[in-house]
Amino acid sequence: MDIDPKLILFGDCTYSNLLHHVQLKESGADISFVSPSKFRGTVTAGEVTYNHILQMYPFENVLYKVKLSGREIITYLEEAYSIFGPKVGNQRKLIGSPQNFDCAGGIRYEADLDKPAGKRIKILGFNDGRKFNIDSVYSVAMVSYRANGGGELMMKATGLQAEELGSRVIEKYSDVRELLFKFFLSGRSLKKLEEN
């Protein structure tokens, strides 16, 4: 099964499913946020080496677990999906950087890009059947770049300044590339991951 990071902008893909799986499994968080990679290529099916992981995920990011309210999670996703502009013909233009896009794992949600900003995201519930409550506080797995204010999504979601975001960190884990390498060393199949 091929891994193509740019497909993340179009919905579920192997790349986002892999990162969500790794982040949720390592952290035990309720929700996972992941973003596209700058990698412009595909890791083809077959044996995956550490070099493939460096190509697919070139960033030095540590996995963080942070706390966000349900309302902040919706605001975060609203900000992430704000990179999509209106449709021109049958194509939707990007009005923001794809690097400032995140998608969520661990929850079922709809993103209606034809709705106005602030009304695009509807969270239906958790993958495990739990209900999502905007007033509850949840644990969210994300990379250190985002947790420390990269792309400003955390600041816009919480209303905090970058230097205040440390108050939201619950725990820090290993480098994401190491976690990906561990996944492939375990012999897990991407196909089985896609089926779950």
Predicted regions and their residues:
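Catalytic centers of hydrolytic enzymes
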Residues: 1-196
